[in-house]
Amino acid sequence: MTLTERLREKISQAFYNHGLLCASYPIPIILFTGLCILACCYPLLKLPLPGTGPVEFSTPVKGYSPPPADSDHKQGEPSEQPEWYVGAPVAYIQQIFVKSSVSPWHRNLLAVDVFRSPLSRAFQLVEEIRNHVLRDSSGTKSLEEVCLQVTDLLPGLRKLRSLLPEHGCLLLSPGNFWQNDWERFHADPDIIGTIHQHEPKTLQTSATLKDLLFGVPGKYSGVSLYTRKRMVSYTITLVFQRYHAKFLSSLRARLMLLHPSPNCSLRAENLVHVHFKEEIGIAELIPLVTTYIILFAYIYFSTRKIDMVKSKWGLALAAVVTVLSSLLMSVGLCTLFGLTPTLNGGEIFPYLVVVIGLENVLVLTKSVVSTPVDLEVKLRIAQGLSSESWSIMKNVATELGIILIGYFTLVPAIQEFCLFAVVGLVSDFFLQMLFFTTVLSIDIRRMELADLNKRLPPESCLPSAKPVGRPARYERQLAVRPSTPHTITLQPSSFRNLRLPKRLRVIYFLARTRLAQRLIMAGTVVWIGILVYTDPAGLRTYLAAQVTEQSPLGEGSLGPMPVPSGVLPASHPDPAFSIFPPDAPKLPENQTLPGELPEHAVPAEGVQDSRAPEVTWGPEDEELWRKLSFRHWPTLFNYYNITLAKRYISLLPVIPVTLHLNPREALEGRHPQDGRTAWAPPEPLPAGLWETGPKGPGGTQTHGDITLYKVAALGLAAGIVLVLLLLCLYRVLCPRNYGQPGGGAGRRRRGELPCDDYGYAPPETEIVPLVLRGHLMDIECLASDGMLLVSCCLAGQVCVWDAQTGDCLTRIPRPGPRRDSCGGGAFEAQENWERLSDGGKASPEEPGDSPPLRRRPRGPPPPSLFGDQPDLTCLIDTNFSVQLPPEPTQPEPRHRAGCGRSRDSGYDFSRLVQRVYQEEGLAAVHMSALRPPSPGPPLPQASQEEGTAPEKGSPPLAWAPSTAGSIWSLELQGSLIVVGRSSGRLEVWDAIEGVLCCSNEEISSGITALVFLDRRIVAARLNGSLDFFSLETHTSLSPLQFRGTPGRGSSPSSPVYSSSNTVACHLTHTVPCAHQKPITALRAAAGRLVTGSQDHTLRVFRLEDSCCLFTLQGHSGAITTVYIDQTMVLASGGQDGAICLWDVLTGSRVSHTFAHRGDVTSLTCTTSCVISSGLDDFINIWDRSTGIKLYSIQQDLGCGASLGVISDNLLVTGGQGCVSFWDLNYGDLLQTVYLGKNSEAQPARQILVLDNAAIVCNFGSELSLVYVPSVLEKLD
């Protein structure tokens, strides 16, 4: 068993056990699921759900004035301004963007020196801003006059009163962590701990206090012990109530004069106005609510047609609750994780949850209600989940793989969507497996057995349903036709064989193909590819940055690389998405970063300088506020009870400030405990993975950014998905026996459907069958009409058996066998030599030597030993493994003794040798005269003298030789047996009396196939011709015997009187050249006759007048098997291994499939599938409507053609001394029955299913009569 098969079996077993758990304890599981839903939706109670994202509108700074409050001043005039751009904004936001670095960097500096000194300069900047005064001709303006004055915080924010300003200007900076007191900052030994002390204990929310005070996202700030880029970024946020252009201009000029940025190219041209809609908008919820209402109605009206469901409303409501709960859980978890949507792509997330959730509901419902209805509820739930386990896990793994690939493209839009999708998939899978499955088990449990029988329509009790393409005239006949007394009616599993309405067909089509999920996955892949291709700061930038950072070249080896500003910006604020600036510190190979210092490292006395990093500015720095959560500004104003719903704010152009600090300032600002603390990690980590470090010197709680854990978890999941992907590719690209010298080691392989394993092993039983003995050689032809069974061996002996009791009713002697019944293995050897000596040609003297055409070996004649003596080497028995069966003490009526010699005397060889001499003489006469001599008394008289069936227990009769030829084909209908011989003779025998009724005496080409249908006989001959006969029965008043030679016209053939009825056989039509080569397959049904030949063609004839309707061409080899039924569905198989389905009404080919590696040996169809077997010892089951291969069953060697269909959902196959029963719908091995110890070494060569639920197995010269086990009758 391969790794994939073991994994599939484990998954199936896990789902089976989970189904048993859900069905056994439904109430506790529903309560547990409800608590989980409430817990995941708890964040929604505190954090209101957003409607849509904020809307932006830009205006130029030059000549800006607030719009008038009267919205009617421009009515009737076309304008590009939005409707909400009316009146003054709530506030004007002015950000002073500070970039600071310590340069040049010394090796004795610590990691904490990267941000301690730059943060200390924030206090000086705040003082400069507060002290700025505008003096002009109109007077003086200070900050207190133009800024937004705030009052108290909300009562629930007492912890933030020492951090946020009250009763003054709304001015925010990182200094607020220390109440804008430099002494507090200087005395703080744990800066990072102070910054993160107000962070939530679980995960960061969308707008944290750190983001509010720093004004930039946390990963862009550079305040981290593990960042490689020694640059700190933060903003000082000023909130103005009125727009004063002169004051703002003077403030910008003063700050840029005090802290110039020589390489800054930021544009100060536009104001950006941001409008915030209502957080809960009814208009935005209408489409989503409408979608769920439509979902409820669709599921309800669809489940009204499912009779296996008790409560239609309950199932529809459960489906809607499942999908809605999945959405709420997803949004709640995303809110808890801080994953708030900032792009329009996040708004389609609820609708994706609806689509995926609906499809999973349909899949689970279809799988569970398709299980057998007579099983216990928990077993039905377990089987339903187990059957879809592999499909569910495969789809989930595929979706997660696509999401992981999209996440690691490092495109922000794709990452946000992927994070939303991961949460949605996990929550949806959780609810499907727990909530909906449990509710479905409760609903099915309420379905009473009486209620089930009452709801089932009468068509469900029929053995077969209406297949696709059946003419309307057969539908009524099938519905009212009662079952015959000897036909077992097997109840089909659930309702899968019923005529489904269109709405259920749509549901099952979606559930079977998972079309919606596949389209979503394909669309996601295309969308990710487009964004990766068009995003300038995505994966390519990140890879280029990694190559630049990890370059082993020493300092000064390469100069700055000129990069276009539009493609790769010189300094992106995100360390993970940026390249080092041209002057970034490049260390030699033997030099470590400051983060690589070991614990308790002592700074070196000697200082080695490296090139100072140059602070650069790029276009992305102009709108860094866009990377903040869209709740950033509403959260800040909500703290002061100011709402931004249906209002807007205006963002002024950023004021850039660059700070360069020398190492001496960094050393002076260092805390005494910094040198004694292990601040640096043992190894450097990529930028952006770590944003926080240990809390303090005391070894307290470590504040790690959740990004590391997310990346680690996603990386592990990506590795698992990659391994599974490689396994799937191995399974698809490599054959089953890849790397193995032979076939599978097991006796039989299960089906390949995921529903094959239900967690239990199929039972194996052993029964003692009825053994039908009496043939001297291997049985070649079998025929039955339900009550009688006729068999014929290679010796030409025909036996008629009672299919109910197994008794031998009649033995029809072959007219003149050349050997005694004691021949055994000697005659097998003799037959082989005779076949070789005949050269494959049938002669009247040797009628038993010509088997059917496809089995006749050809070869040179044996060398003669003496010139005038016959060759007696054929009498030597070299088969020492075959022993003569001992005579039973009390022979049973149904068992015939194999030998007629007595125990007193030895074996008499005289007759055997004498026959060989006689055969030599007869052969010489045959070669000279080309006409056989008279064999003695006429055959009808011999049959009449022999009488009817011989007495039970009497030895076999010795028959005289004849020129009739060996039997090549055999058919049975009623009490008449039609025999086709190699000499071309057609015989009709009475199966009860054992007498010859009539025959066609004209010597012609051998009859290779027969059809006996409604008193019409069609004989296919070796030369490719067809003969159509009709039988007539006349009641004669006196025994009469007719003599004469039959003619080929309309005159009757010579009938032979039998009992009181005379059967006459008339040749009505002849098709002399139906095919160019021998006809190998012949079938008739629904008034049509189909022939298959070695000339690669099939022909369709009308049975009543032998008119050729169609010539079907589609095979590249000889036709080996043909199937046709009353629904005008025709299937054919050939030596090319192909299977073709044809429409008999139009003569067109419906499908063509290469099914086997070799000849197709047998072919049959049910209402839903096509079953084929081949010389490769595989039985393949195909979907009849689509032509898709469902699964395969590997047979034992030599048992490939031994199969039979008991009903539309039950298949029987033969093996080494056993028969196996399979469920056709799923490929499950239901039961294996061993036929006693005597048959273990014998393969079942042929299986014939009788109408009385009996199975006839051909084990060489013996037949075994087996009845369908009662266990299977109950299962069906």
Curated annotation (Swiss-Prot):
Record-listed Omega-N-methylarginine modification sites: R1048
Bilayer disposition of the protein: Multi-pass membrane protein
Phosphoserine PTM sites in chain numbering: S821, S837, S843, S850, S905, S934
Region Disordered: start-end pairs: 60-81, 834-903, 928-958
Gene3D superfamilies (UniProt xref): YVTN repeat-like/Quinoprotein amine dehydrogenase
Entries under PROSITE patterns matching the protein: SSD, WD_REPEATS_1, WD_REPEATS_2, WD_REPEATS_REGION
Annotated stretches, region: Loop-1: 46-284
UniProt signal peptide: none
Single GO biological process annotation from the record: SREBP signaling pathway
Side Lumenal, residues: 40-279, 334-344, 423, 540-707
MF terms in GO: protein-containing complex binding; sterol binding
Cytoplasmic side stretches: 1-18, 301-312, 366-401, 445-518, 729-1276
Residue ranges occupied by any SSD domain in the UniProt entry: 284-442
Cross-link Glycyl lysine isopeptide (Lys-Gly) (interchain with G-Cter in ubiquitin), sequence positions: K454, K466
Assembly: Membrane region forms a homotetramer. Component of the SCAP-SREBP complex (composed of SCAP and SREBF1/SREBP1 or SREBF2/SREBP2); interacts with SREBF1/SREBP1 or SREBF2/SREBP2 through its C-terminal cytoplasmic domain. Forms a ternary complex with INSIG1 or INSIG2 through its transmembrane domains at high sterol concentrations. Interacts with PAQR3; the interaction anchors the SCAP-SREBP complex to the Golgi apparatus in low cholesterol conditions. Interacts with the SEC23-SEC24 complex in a SAR1-GTP-dependent manner through an ER export signal in its third cytoplasmic loop.
Comment, domains: Loop-1 binds to loop-7, enabling interaction with COPII-coated vesicles. When levels of cholesterol in the endoplasmic reticulum increase, Loop-1 binds to cholesterol instead, thereby disrupting direct binding between the two loops and preventing the SCAP-SREBP complex from exiting the endoplasmic reticulum.
Protein name: Sterol regulatory element-binding protein cleavage-activating protein
Species per Swiss-Prot/TrEMBL record: Rattus norvegicus
Higher taxonomy: Eukaryota, Metazoa, Chordata, Craniata, Vertebrata
Designated gene of the protein: Scap
